[in-house]
Amino acid sequence: MRRALINSRNVPAIQAIQQVVDEVGMDQIKEFATSLGIDDYGTDFVEAKGLGGFTYGTDPLAMSAAYAAFGRGGIYIEPYTFTRIVYIETEEEYVHPIEQTRVMSEETAYMITDILVDAGVSGVGGNFSIQGTDIAAKGGTSTISASDAEAYDVPRSATPNHWNITYSPDYSIALWLGHDKLTDGYLTSGTGYNPRRQIMAAVATRIYETGSRFEQPSGVVSATIELGTYPLQLASEYTPSNLKSTELFKAGYEPTEVSSRFDTLADPTNGTSTYDGSTIRISWDAIEIPDAINPDYLEEYFNGYFSDYYAEYAEEYYQDRIAYNDANIGTIGYQVYLQDASGNLVSLGYTTNNYYTYSAS
């Protein structure tokens, strides 16, 4: 999810919607989006809405308010244009009431924010930073259909809508860049990317305050997991550093099982030897092939995990794992040593068999 949100990947977004729909139904997703002030859905809420497939779309004010709810720990406040009115004649004061609605748990809000802070650090919102302040960021574009590209005589690479949203614990800023009509002109990913970041940097550096951090709720815990485990497992002491990632979880939902993919091998057992006067033949009981490099196990592993969702990916993940193992681990083999009279070990050779023959002459 972290990489998908930072890089604005569409497929994971739809996959997430599909899985949540299976659990709670599409209506609950619609209710959640509506509670954030995003409600241009018409009569039906369909998966395409998860990628911004609206009839007319939303606007920067609504998007700013929606993202502010994440920065506010899950509390949504409908936008308003003034805080108070003071009547000149009577000096009577009217203070605009602030209606706060909890639309998500503070744990959910913080975990999404933590991901988007990483996006901000990576420059999604723009090339700027505020001293001592966390800045969360989310960018995005929309594309056009082949028929629209032909009708308006614009390239298929045209991206009519460019979005850039950033928020801190204190403020939320949303920016839209584009043309109201394709007949007025068009942008592409290349021509829209830098301007939207530059405009945001110019605005944000004049608004955001220094020294403001998002506070992690007590209901959020961190755990170091091993990438490529399905379902998710904790990293072991042998997990390579490039396959470790420290992620956030709602307390009680963090993984508890430690991955056994990377581990020490068992020792061979029942070693025997024979000597015929010139050669020594030693043999032993071969160790079992660990599941992590057993093709039969891995095929069953991926087919089983992806049986409920996206079975078409099982073969791809399986082949990726086989390729990784071939490049980084290899096959089971045995290094054979001779111990001399002084106790030193001398390497005799390597074998993938469970026996080795050595000439003693």
Regions found by a protein language model. Give the residues of each.
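Pro/Thr/Ser/Gly-rich low-complexity, intrinsically disordered linker/stalk tracts
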Residues: 253-311, 315-316, 323
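Solvent-exposed strand-loop boundary residues in beta-sheet-rich modules
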Residues: 89, 340-344
